[in-house]
Amino acid sequence: MGKALVIVESPAKAKTINKYLGNDYVVKSSVGHIRDLPTSGSAAKKSADSTSTKTAKKPKKDERGALVNRMGVDPWHNWDAHYEVLPGKEKVVSELKQLAEKADHIYLATDLDREGEAIAWHLREVIGGDDARYSRVVFNEITKNAIRQAFEQPGELNINRVNAQQARRFMDRVVGYMVSPLLWKKIARGLSAGRVQSVAVRLVVEREREIKAFVPEEFWEIDANTTTPSGEALPLQVTHQNDKPFRPVNREQTLAAVSLLEKARYSVLEREDKPTSSKPGAPFITSTLQQAASTRLGFGVKKTMMMAQRLYEAGYITYMRTDSTNLSQDAVNMVRGYIGDNFGKKYLPDNPNQYASKENSQEAHEAIRPSDVAVMAESLKDMEADAQKLYQLIWRQFVACQMTPAQYDSTTLTVGAGEFRLKARGRILRFDGWTKVMPALRKGDEDRTLPAVNKGDALTLLELTPAQHFTKPPARFSEASLVKELEKRGIGRPSTYASIISTIQDRGYVRVENRRFYAEKMGEIVTDRLEENFRELMNYDFTAQMEDSLDQVANHQAEWKAVLDNFFSDFTQQLDKAEKDPEEGGMRPNQMVLTSIDCPTCGRKMGIRTASTGVFLGCSGYALSPKERCKTTINLVPENEVLNVLEGDDAETNALRAKRRCQKCGTAMDSYLIDPKRKLHVCGNNPTCDGYEIEEGEFRIKGYDGPIVECEKCGSEMHLKMGRFGKYMACTNDECKNTRKILRNGEVAPPKEDPVPLPELPCEKSDAYFVLRDGAAGIFLAANTFPKSRETRAPLVEELYRFRDRLPEKLRYLADAPQQDPEGNKTVVRFSRKTKQQYVAAEKDGKATGWSAFFVDGKWVEGKK
C-alpha cells in the first residue's frame, strides 16, 4: 500500500502537521499560490489566440484582444480565464506531480478561507487525475486533535468558495487593467486604480479634506484646586454657570469668571456614590487583533498578520483570518477550567460569556485564540520576540473574555461656588475581574480616590488655573483605525484588510508619517476623477454590496458569472463615457492652475501642476506646438516636508492655526518654498479651487538644524542649499562640488562612495558597461552612459568577489558574502528599507528563492528577511 500525499501552502505548516501524521503520509508545501492570471501579455498568448479569429476584423476588437491577452481573463466570452504557473514555481509543481503519481490519495489541506480553497482547486487542476483521488481537509487550528478529526472526516472541494475567490480576482483585474490606462491618458503616466483600493484611498482623502476644512475654535477651561476641612486636596473643574454649560470662548470671558470664582464660597452640594462594572471585550477577530496590536504593541497591520501567520502555522493559535467571535465548546470548557484552577471561582462567571458576531460573519469559524491555554508566551522558544508578544496579547484577550466583570465604586462630587458648579469624579477598583489578565493601557482621569467629604462641607480655594484650548479636527486614520472603518462600512474581508492597507501605500496616493495617513495631492485628484466618472465603483455602499454578493456566491446563493456580468455591464458603460472628451461628460484632465509668476525662460505665466512626484510650477507654454513648447519647471519644496513630523495631541490643531486660509473657499492652504525670497500658498482644494497667494520675504530653508557637516572629500564645511529636486548640503569649497542629500527625517544622508567602473561587465541593452554606484538604497550597477542608457541591476556577489580589490573598504564585506544558496542558486545584493541595511538573497530566473543571508556581528548569517 502506497502513501497518501498531503499538500499545504507553507513549509512551516507542513512541518507542524507532519508531527501529527504517521508514516503513511507525505506532507509537502506548495509555498503559496502555484498559478495565477498572467503577469504579462506574452504569458497569456494562448488565451488571446483563442479569440483572435473572432476579433481580427475590426481595430476596436483587436485592441480588445490585446487587452484580454494582458488581463488573462475575457469578460466578453463567459469570463474565460487563462491561468499560468507562477514564475519560479515550476520545480514545486513538478515535484508535487511526481509525488501525486505515486500516492494512493491526495489530501488538500490548505487554509480554510476562500483563498485557501482557491489554492486547493488550482493544485487539483494542475496536478490533474481523477477527482476521486482528492479530498479536502480543513482545520481551524493545527493541533493533534484537530488534525485527527479533519482526516477522519475529509470533504470535497467547495467550488462555490473557489468561484467567489475567482469573481473577486476577476473584478479586481478588470478594474485595474481597464481604468488605469484611462488615468494614464487623462491625468498622468504610472497611475493605477483598484476596485477596493480606490475606495480605501477615498476614505483617507475625505478625512484629509475634513481636516483642511476644519477651523479650530478657541475655548477655555478653569480648574480649581481646593482643600477639604481635613486638609486633603480636591481638584475640581468648572462645568456650569447659571445652570448652563460653562465654555468661555476667549480670555476676557474666562478672566471675568475667574474674578467671580475668587470671591465665591465653595461647598459640597452633592455626593453620589454608586457601584459600576466593566465587562470584558470579545475574543479577537482579525480587525480587532490588528487594532489591539497597533495600540498595545505598536505593530502595523502587515506585521501583525505576519506574526499571527507564523503562530498559526506553528500550531499555537487558531486561524487568524476570521470575522467571527464564536468559540467552540471545547475552547470554552478549556478556558473556564483554566480560570477556575488558576484564579478561583470569583473570576469565573456562572455561565460562559456570549458575544454576538456580525450578521454576515462565518459562524463556522472561531475567534482567534490560543490552541492550548496552558501554553504561555515565554515557552514559545522557537518563535521570535514579536510573535511571543502577539501570542501573549491573544492569550490575555481569550482568557479575559470568559472572566467576570471588573467592579468599581464610582463617586461624583458636585460643588457650588456662587453662580458656578464644579465637579470631580473618582473611581476605585473594588474587584479586578478580567482586568487581572488584561490590564488597562493607562489609567483614566477618573481612576483616582476622592477625599471623604459630605454634602454641606465647606472647601477652601487654593488656586484657579485657566487654560486655553482649541477644538481639534477629526483624527487622522492609523492603519488599525482605517481597518476598523473598512470593517464598519463592510468593505473588504478579514483576508483582504492587510493587502488593502499595503496596496494604498505602495501606489503613492497616501503616505504614512508617525503612523498616521496623509493623502497625497495626486491621490486627491485621482479620487475626484474616479468619483465623477465611476460613481458606483467609488460608492461605499456599492462596494459593501459587492462583498455581500461574493458572500452569496460562496454560500451557493448566487451564480458567480451572473454577478460578474452585472458588474461588468454597468462598469463598461461608465468606462465608455469616461473615455470621451470632458465636454461630452468624459474624465477631466489634470489641469494646471495659472499663476502670476513669470517663466524665467520664456516669460509666459507659470502654472501649479501636480504629478505623481508632487506639486511643481510648470510653464504654460508646455501646451504649445513642439516648435514653441517651453518645458521649464520650478521645483517647490513643501512646507510639510521641511518641518518636523507632527507629534502630540494638539499638533494638528496648531498646524491648522498656523496655515493661511484660502480667500475663495476658506480651506487651509498648503505652503511651498519657491526660492529663498518667495513662498507660494496653494488652496488645499487645488486644482478644484484655483486660490493661491504669493508671499515675499526672506525665507530660511528649514530642514536641517543639526551639527556642522564636514565634507568627507575635502574637509570644508557643507551648507544647506535648495535645488530643482529639493534640499541638499553643498560643500563650500567651489573646487570640490561635493553634495549630500537631506533625508525625509531631516538628517543629512551618509556619504556615498565614488562610482567604481567595471568595463569587464557589459550592459545587455546597449554598448555601455556597468559602473558600481552607491545610492540611498544601497549599491547597484548602472550603465556608464547614464542618462543615455538607464539600465540598472543588482550586483551578483560573485561579481563583487571578482572585483574585490577595486571596492572601497566599507563595501568589501559584501564581496565576502555567500555566492550561492545550498541549492546552487546565485546570490545578489539587496537592500532592506526596513532595517536600512544590505543583505544577500538567492534568485533563480529573476525570482527570489526565499533564501537570504545577513551580516551580523562581523559575519554572514543565514536567515529570513
UniProtKB/Swiss-Prot annotation:
Catalytic residues of the enzyme: Y319
Catalytic reaction list: ATP-independent breakage of single-stranded DNA, followed by passage and rejoining
GO terms classed as biological process: DNA topological change
Compositionally biased spans, kind Low complexity: 39-54
Domain Topo IA-type catalytic: 158-575
PANTHER family according to UniProt: DNA TOPOISOMERASE, DNA TOPOISOMERASE, TYPE IA, CORE
Entries under NCBIfam families matching the protein: topA_bact
Protein name: DNA topoisomerase 1
